[in-house]
Amino acid sequence: MERDQASKFINDLLKLMVSRNGSDLFITAEFPPAIKVDGKVTKVSPQPLTPNHTLTLARAVMSDKQVADFERTKECNFAISPAGIGRFRVNAFIQQGRVGMVMRTIPLTLPTIDGLGVPQVLKEVTMAKRGLCILVGATGSGKSTTLAAMVDWRNENSFGHIITVEDPVEFVHPHKNCVVTQREVGLDTDSWEAALKNTLRQAPDVILMGEIRDRETMEHAVAFAETGHLCLATLHANSANQALDRIINFFPEERRPQLLMDLSLNLRAMVSQRLIPKQDGKGRAAAVEIMLNTPLISDLIFKGDVHEIKEIMKKSRNLGMQTFDQALFDAYEANVISYEDALRNADSLNDLRLQIKLNSQRAKSPDLASGTEHFAIV
């Protein structure tokens, strides 16, 4: 396969993925090209790719510098925007001595908080003058999309300087009421460390720093919040509690009391997200858990009593907080998701089942009683 053929082949696959509203394209040796739609991977060709195919396809979407970096490090992250097709985040890697790629769709239209259907309290969080807001979720849970919607809201509703440090830049934000500076690691700066070190010299109001991966990145995030900036970041975890545990475990035992004090003073919000298949089969809906740093939450963080936070969240919906199970109950009650999917994604299956049994109007509906639903409340 020649480079021109490889470029056309990739573009045809990307067009197909876009036409099916797919989220990811998988290129791997000894397996046909495949796309993920609504969380399910589907082959799009009967013919497996050879190792030579995957190598040629990867090189076809890379610049010469990226090819050299990939050969040296065996990893490469970048974004591409083939004309008339869209924008995609690319991760190239080696697995079992062979080249593989995953190409993720980045919508060209910026998402909005209203359009995503996420809680309105995120608008308030996004407009905070200072503090740390961390978006939590597994890979593919929509963290980057929600974060882009939050940045766009701030861009439209304030006047300041927003800086993003990303690897790679995903959503491209135009200047609206804010100046938006987007820096890509490897393209606009040599490293995360160099970019983050110099960020405070660029007079920012909001700093989006991508993923918190280690202690050093976490230290930068806290420092940005302490110096009067709003810092937005992501973290791989399944819930607010798990995220706090993971952050604490970044640090050695002797550093943790200081960390807990810093978090208690500077954390603004912890937003956890999961994508649940919609009942009508048309896409997925976001179930969002929100922890806001109220005085009571702050005190629990300071003391290290992280395990007690979820109970406070359950009782603080009037303040804008909610747990995953409360979000799932609301989505089920609104006929957005099925009973099975609600329970499948619950933090506490028994608690959610009981909540639906006792409080759900949908569960008491005639349709359910007549057996037209394919589940039973027990």
What kind of feature is each model-predicted range?
Residues 1-378:
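Short, flexible helix-loop junctions that flank or precede catalytic/ligand sites
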